[in-house]
Amino acid sequence: MTQYNVTGMSCAACSARVEKAVSKVPGVTSCSVSLLTNSMGVEGTASDKAIISAVQKAGYGASKKGGSKAAESADESALRDTETPKLKKRLFWSVGFLIILMYFSMGHMMWGWPLPSFYNSNHVAMGLTQLLLTVIIMVINQKFFISGFKSLWHRAPNMDTLVALGSTAAFVYSTYALFMMTDAQTRGDMQAVNTYMMDFYFESAAMILTLITVGKTLEARSKGKTTDALKSLMKLAPKSAVILKDGEEKTVPIDTVQKDDIFLVRPGESIPADGVIIEGESAVDESALTGESIPVDKAAGDKVSAATVNRSGFLKCRAIHVGEDTTLSQIIKMVSDAAATKAPIAKIADKVSGIFVPAVIIIAVITTVIWLLLGHGVGYALARGISVLVISCPCALGLATPVAIMVGSGLGAKNGILFKTAASLEETGRIQIVALDKTGTITKGEPRVTDIIPNGETTENELLKAAASLEKKSEHPLAKAVISYAESKNIICDDVSIFKALPGNGLSGTVNGKNIFAGNLNFIKTKAEISPGIKEIAERLSGDGKTPLFFALDGKLLGIIAVADVIKDDSPKAVKELRNMGIRVVMLTGDNERTANAIGKSAGVDEVIAGVLPSGKEEAIKKLKKLGKVAMVGDGINDAPALTIADIGLAIGAGTDVAIDAADVVLMKSRLSDVPAAIRLSRATLRNIHENLFWAFFYNTIGIPIAAGVFIPLGLTLNPMLGAAAMSLSSFCVVTNALRLNLFKLRDASHDHKIKNHLKNVTEESKAMEKTIKIEGMMCGHCEAAVKKALEELPEVESAEVSHVSGTAKVTLKDEIDNDVLKKAVEDKDYKVIGIE
């Protein structure tokens, strides 16, 4: 996606106009414009020149975001709030001159404030003073007129057009009244003079501009806060690094650091690039990236990330990712891209915004004409029309979704949860089923010793010493678990000679002149006597999802060491939270059914799908999708296809780059508890968007009829000044409501809302969609092929597995089918159907 800066946009109608114009450029496949960040993301083959030209023809300015992506991402000045200071300055002078104008126009009438003697009975001077003060305020706020009339000229009216038309109408009519009053005074018609003076709307013309500026200032300030999370991430990027070159330490700008450079980090300093530690040990604070407050111990060989803080020791590292490739830059890019994309829910507001302003102008004209036809004066009718113009606010509609998306994605980034697009932030909250890969997601992904059971007089240390001595020669993952545990207990291993690895059985060797063996039950019972009690223990361990390793020395059983891929500490709690949210939790694993069920029971999942090969995960997700919206959580290369095909793919942060690229949501910390937190945040963001859209639609639906005077018979009316005040506050209310998301607690499960799904198990569903046909008469492979073809030609049949050896055809169905139809298809090929199950 190519990013562009867009200038001149003031409301949702502007962004809709730009998006429409660029989407028509040949070669553009998608275009998304963000009013919040004044940016545009374009995909396709169209040239920069063609895209920029289309934006300019629409009446706006555009430029490609220059420089390297790394520099662009690292420079927080791109998001600095430059609009608020300008608006504050405009507001200061506008309010100053408005106070003087209000003093002359209303002070003497409403509060009896004295006027300079020069103005006594000098109505023309009074009118001219009001005109001049209004002109000054209009010049101060000329941006409304330049933008508004320019957009009108390009046949793309926006919010500024409504303000400009409303203020201009009030000013022009007041100027006309001033000329007519001057003529009446020249003729000595004082009654006409007083009548025309009452038709002055100079203060309304000025008040509209000032109040809209108040609203714009509040809105700009609030919008600036929505990007605080992104700006705080950008500020984390170190500005310099200390590198080691030719034996000398040099402090260099961060953008000059190259891959494979050696850099040094002292205690208290930020790590400048992603790298691997060559020398040194330290505790590194990774809270900025993962949200984890406890520093992580690091030593030689461990990886470190840019913007994390070295808390204790001295580190010497080699850079492996620099500039735009660092973890920090990738996080910033993901958050920026999420803000640049549009959530599906925003399409409604976009469609309305595109026709909103022209519709309001038409309503204002009709309103004015109707009041004139009802016999009211021009001033009264014009006031109703102006009220319609200035109360209508497309900005509230346009901001309803993007501000919530920006705040939500920023809050997620602060907590180590990265949503790649606005759509993923919206859809995550609608998930009904969560499929969890077992290894590395529910479990820690590395086998560990869970039980040590010595036999007879053998002690734990004796068993562990013998086991570690033999396993030290093995490369098997289970062997590493035993060795690691022995090292943690400071066990000193003996030397082993004549070592042999016996595939499918175990290990053998000689230690201190004695024969030692390790392996499964079938192997060890040929080397030593196994009591029924030991067999029962092994059976129980297997039932708990653990692998029992037997060890024997010179014909005597030493004992059992159980090894298992242990469940992460937070997995059961995370699964429980998901279930409490009304989400069905399914575990996918390649383990056998017995082991898988044991782990699934410990984790607390609803359903276990065992024996799933890496290539079969994709098929399992397809079946789950028939039951509801599915999220897949995984961390490995073999999870990538399943992550892609799921409605939402969530990659655990410690996983591979392939898995992270395939996912819609990245969990920076390898915590399963971040899955319910991500769903919780998505639901809160979606709820906030609904609130914003409701307010925006409700405000305009109620406000426009009131301004038009529909409720005047009930005594409810609205003058242009109150209309402008309401308009100025509408966008501010929407943005402020979105900022409330910053107070949301992602990990607070006490307010989780349970959604009733009533979903079947996929295993139950699969059984319901399978039938086994018992057939007589099949003799060879040709018979199998004939029956298979006959069955698969039926539209309700997805696939058929036929065996002449067992005399069966196992049929997988797409839809319900009568047994008689299946029977006829087989018997038409001259075979006999005995039964169908």
Predicted regions mapped to residue ranges:
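Juxtamembrane coupling segments of multi-pass membrane pumps/enzymes
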Residues: 2, 181, 190-192, 206-267, ...
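Flexible metal-binding regulatory segments at protein termini and peripheral loops
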Residues: 1-125, 248-251, 333-341, 745-837
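Conserved cytosolic catalytic loops of P-type ATPases
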Residues: 26-43, 48-49, 53, 200, ...
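Conserved catalytic phosphorylation-site environment of P-type ATPases
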Residues: 289, 348, 383, 396-470, ...
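P-type ATPase nucleotide-binding
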Residues: 449, 453-581, 593, 605-621
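Conserved ATP-binding TGD loop and adjacent catalytic N/P-domain core of P-type ATPases
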Residues: 16, 29, 267, 321, ...
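Transmembrane helix-loop-helix hairpins at the membrane interface
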Residues: 86-240, 351, 720
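Membrane-embedded alpha-helical bundles of multi-pass transporters
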Residues: 110-124, 153, 172, 411, ...
